[in-house]
Amino acid sequence: MNNIRKTHPLMKIVNSSFIDLPAPSNISSWWNFGSLLGICLVAQILTGLFLAMHYTSDTMTAFSSVTHICRDVNYGWLIRYLHANGASMFFICLFLHVGRGLYYGSYMYLETWNIGVLLLFAVMATAFMGYVLPWGQMSFWGATVITNLLSAIPYIGTNLVEWIWGGFSVDKATLTRFFAFHFILPFIVAALAGVHLLFLHETGSNNPSGLNSDTDKIPFHPYYTIKDILGALIMITALSSLVLFSPDLLGDPDNYIPANPLNTPPHIKPEWYFLFAYAILRSIPNKLGGVLALVLSIAILAIIPLLHTAKQRSMMFRPLSQCLFWILVADLFTLTWIGGQPVEHPFVVIGQLASVIYFMLILLIMPTTSMIENQLLKW
C-alpha cells in the first residue's frame, strides 16, 4: 500500500516541504528564523482576529474599545499584549533572518531574496497601520507625521496625502481604512511567505559554508523539525516573559493618552523597530531627500546581490568582511538609539554620521573589501 503522505495531492505538498525535504546537514540555528517567523505570523493573525472582534475603528470609541478589551474581555489584556509584543518578536526574528541572509550570502537566491524584501516592506506597512489603531497620542501623531512625508513627492504629493487621509487631516476615514488594510495585509504576507518558500525549495537551502551541499543532505524531519521546535520554545518563553512581566517595556507611555489633535507630544517617534529608518530620515535636512533615504535604507537590500564582488558566497572564510558586517550591525544599533532621541546636539551629528556610514558600508566599503579579499586568496 502506498504511503498516503506521498500520494495524497495535499499531503505530498506538505511532505515535500516539511518532512522529506532534503536539507543541508550543517545548517546552524541561524536557519531557525524562517519557521519562527511563520509561528509569529500565525500568532499575530490569531490574536489580531480576536482583538478585531472587540475593537471599533471609530475615532470616538477606538481608544475606549482597546481599554474595554484590556479591562472587561476575558484574557483581553493577554491577547492585546501578545499582539503588541508579538510584533516586536516578529521584527527581532525578521532582522536576525535578514542578517543571516547577508552574512551567509543567501541573497544569491535572487527570487527568494527579492520576495523577502517585498515581505519586509509588507510587514513594516502592517505594523505601522496597526500602531495607529489604539488611537493614542503617538498613534495619531505618528500617522500624521509619516503619512505627511508623502507630501514631499513633487506635483502629486499633497493630493496623495489627502487621498490617503480621506480628508484634510488624519481622522475617522483614516482610522477606518487603516483598520481595513491592517486586517487584510497579514493574509497577503502569508501568501507571499508561501511564494518565498516555493522559490526557496526550487534551489534548496544555503548553508554556513556557502558551498554546494547536494552531496550531503539529510531529511528535514526529524532533524530540523525537532531543532525548530526547540527554537520555537525559546522564542515563546521570551515572548511570554515579556508579555507577563513587562508588557509595556517596548511601548510608548504617550500612547496611553487619547489622541488629541490640539496637543503635540514633545517627541514624536515610531515603535523601536522603525527607529533606525526614522533616524536616517531625520538626519537629512531636506524633506524629499529624507524620504528617499528612508525608503532606500530598506530598498537597498534589493541591490545587495549586485554588490556581491567576492569569490566566496559566505562570509564564513572572509574575516575582513566579517569585521565590516559587525560594524554595520553596531551602526544599526546606533541609528536605533538616535531615532529615539530628541533632535538636538550631539544626537543630530551622530545620526548623520551613522547614516553616512550605513550607506557607505553597504555601497562602497564592503564590495571593495571583498575585492581585496579576492586578491588575498592568491597569496
Curated annotation (Swiss-Prot):
GO molecular function, one term: ubiquinol-cytochrome-c reductase activity
Entry superkingdom: Eukaryota
Segments passing through the bilayer: 33-53, 77-98, 113-133, 178-198, 226-246, 288-308, 320-340, 347-367
A cellular-component GO term for this protein: respiratory chain complex III
Binding-site residues for a ubiquinone, renumbered to this chain: H201
Pfam families named in the record: Cytochrom_B_C, Cytochrome_B
Cofactor binding remark: Binds 2 heme b groups non-covalently.
Cofactor entry: heme b
Membrane topology label: Multi-pass membrane protein
Cellular compartment(s): Mitochondrion inner membrane
Binding partners and assembly: The cytochrome bc1 complex contains 11 subunits: 3 respiratory subunits (MT-CYB, CYC1 and UQCRFS1), 2 core proteins (UQCRC1 and UQCRC2) and 6 low-molecular weight proteins (UQCRH/QCR6, UQCRB/QCR7, UQCRQ/QCR8, UQCR10/QCR9, UQCR11/QCR10 and a cleavage product of UQCRFS1). This cytochrome bc1 complex then forms a dimer.
Family membership noted in the UniProt record: Belongs to the cytochrome b family.
Functional summary from the UniProt entry: Component of the ubiquinol-cytochrome c reductase complex (complex III or cytochrome b-c1 complex) that is part of the mitochondrial respiratory chain. The b-c1 complex mediates electron transfer from ubiquinol to cytochrome c. Contributes to the generation of a proton gradient across the mitochondrial membrane that is then used for ATP synthesis.
Protein name in UniProt: Cytochrome b
